[in-house]
């Protein structure tokens, strides 16, 4: 049964929920117990009190957390002069920026242009890895990802296009 609610994440309340668990189609199917078992939700959204940006964390198909900052289509970070291989440059976040484009968290009606990252890199432990008996690497808990999203939101808020910095 899906859960929905609020979680206190220090300065804000995060709206949380779970995806509908269709047998054979949920990241947790057959997954061994681990640190992720103490995080019974699949996504969370909040408005960052410091920047005013809508932020989100959500699990991918491997059960790893991904983090996103919704900066709005007009934000200068989306300008073509600020991209390298389609991703914003000069942002320091876990594993680097791996998402830049339209994103949605449909269960809570959050959507728009977002910058994001994932925690499924070499050295990261994904819950689905346990199905194949791989239990190495470091699992990045939701609390870690929330901290990275907050840092990313501040970097996006402070972002200035290169031409403004040089000219």
Language model features by range: what are they?
Residues 44, 79-167:
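Polybasic, proline/glycine-rich intrinsically disordered low-complexity segments
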Residues 2-56:
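Charge-rich, low-complexity N-terminal segments
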Residues 11, 27-28, 40, 47-52, ...:
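Generic signature of intrinsically disordered, low-complexity, basic-rich segments
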Residues 34-87:
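Amphipathic, interaction-prone secondary-structure segments
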Residues 3-5, 24, 77, 89, ...:
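Generic low-complexity segments that are intrinsically disordered, proline-rich and/or Lys/Arg-biased
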Residues 6, 12, 34, 60, ...:
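Compositionally biased, intrinsically disordered low-complexity segments
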